[in-house]
Amino acid sequence: MHTMYRSIHLGTLLVLSVPTLLACGSRPVEVAAAPTTKQAQPKRESDSIVVSSEVGGLDEDAVNGVFEKVQSGLTNCVRKGARRVELLGGDVAFFVGINLSGQAEDTRVERSTLGDRETESCMIAVLKSRSWPKPVGGRKGQVHKAFSFDMPNEARPPVEWSADDVEDTLRKLHRRADKCTGGSGTYQVTAYIDTRGSAISVGVAPPDTSGEAKVDCLVEVVKNAKFKSPGSYPAKVSFEL
């Protein structure tokens, strides 16, 4: 039995201005010091937070503590998903937007190669269920965090396909996908394709918060598509729509 997650880095990137994604498997990124301004900075744990900008800072240690608590929940999501999708495994990165009450009101998948919407939704629910540190000096705190999971099941990994391997299907998919998305933004899709050319499972990372509501529609479009057969063993492929 493989270890459920290869490594989960708790060096969370706390965003003060422009969000930067912490790449999966990379070393923890040090948090940049807050820019000097003429306005006095409020105390970290103050109950009366001074709102000076849209994006505020977060207590790094407190955020790391939340991620330590959610590890088991995220792992359980993958385990449950692997009961349905035998070859489930991969990387996933989240965006968590935290309001002044410490609630994760804006949580979504930023990128993922898990290839299972149900598992990704389970993970989002885990992150939303936790209380987070309140942002300081802004209306909203932003966290970007990446995780990596090995396949829970003792199985041969799927055949790795590139987008070129499904080029014919993608040409037919774009028009139907646009009906879901309105033609706005680029959605990152990962799917497992069985030996008959049907999608076993599909996961999607939307381009922004508004795109989250369109993901389920897009998943159904891909599931109903016909792909070429990968041969005698299922394939895994990532592409954009």
Language-model-detected regions and their locations in the chain:
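Charge-biased low-complexity segments
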Residues: 25-241
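C-terminal motif of bacterial Sec signal peptides marking the signal peptidase cleavage site
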Residues: 21-23
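Bacterial N-terminal signal peptides that target proteins for export
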Residues: 2-15
